[in-house]
Design a protein with these regions (language model features):
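Acidic-basic catalytic patches of nuclease active cores, encompassing PD-(D/E)XK
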Residues: 1-36, 46-48, 180-181
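Conserved catalytic cores of phosphodiester-cleaving nucleases, focusing on short active-site segments
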Residues: 42-44, 51-63
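Short beta-strand-loop-alpha-helix junction that forms the active-site gateway
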Residues: 57-76
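Mixed-charge (Asp/Glu-Lys/Arg
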Residues: 83-90, 148-150
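Nucleic-acid nuclease catalytic cores
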Residues: 87-121
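Short, low-complexity, polybasic intrinsically disordered segments
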Residues: 110-151
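Charged phosphate-binding loop/patch that engages nucleotide di/tri-phosphates or the phosphate backbone
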Residues: 137-181
């Protein structure tokens, strides 16, 4: 299952980043309870707001779809669409949300993931768009999969932090805080 594997890859990438760069954060999969709607796939917990994240992971083959469709790639149990449910949860929890889209390009080509700010997802949904166009997705911060895994560095994380909805948005200040080892 590409989706579940991608979720595990995200958890490993965030936890490896924390270990490598001495950040106090922990990432884990947010498992779906039976008969309950799921809220985000991966959560990242940390005292600094910069790493207090909720990630919705989608893994797609770009040769088969031109965009990420709201009806096809998101759920709507009990008539409440996943984007609405997760947007409300972000508002209540204070987390920063990202739609992390993995583009599987096939054998011999590199696989990449893109961090789309949740505000873009919510805006497109509320505007009545069919989905999120590939142009929007590919303009967001991205990371390539190498050696079978994603590896984040400070430069990539700074790009992600600049996309946050809440403050502070200065990644350098986040790194100097007492929360670093």
């Amino acid at each position: 299952m590409p989706g579940q594997e991608f979720e595990r890859d995200m958890v490993h990438a965030w936890n490896a980043y924390a270990e490598t760069y001495g950040k106090k954060l922990i990432a884990y999969r947010h498992y779906q309870m039976r008969y309950q709607p799921q809220l985000f796939d991966v959560l990242v917990d940390s005292r600094p707001n910069e790493f207090y994240l909720a990630l919705e992971c989608k893994s797609i083959d770009p040769s088969t779809v031109s965009q990420l469709y709201f009806k096809q790639h998101f759920s709507a149990p009990k008539g409440i669409h996943q984007v609405i449910r997760e947007s409300e949860w972000l508002s209540l929890s204070g987390r920063n949300g990202f739609l992390v889209v993995e583009l599987r390009r096939g054998k011999g080509k590199h696989t990449s993931c893109f961090f789309v700010p949740w505000r873009s997802v919510s805006y497109n949904f509320k505007a009545g768009e069919k989905g999120i166009d590939s142009e929007i997705i590919t303009r967001c911060p991205s990371c390539d999969k190498r050696g079978g895994k994603y590896t984040f560095d400070d430069e990539f994380i700074e790009q992600v932090v600049r996309m946050l909805d809440s403050y502070p948005k200065d990644a350098k200040k986040a790194y100097k805080k007492k929360w670093s080892k």
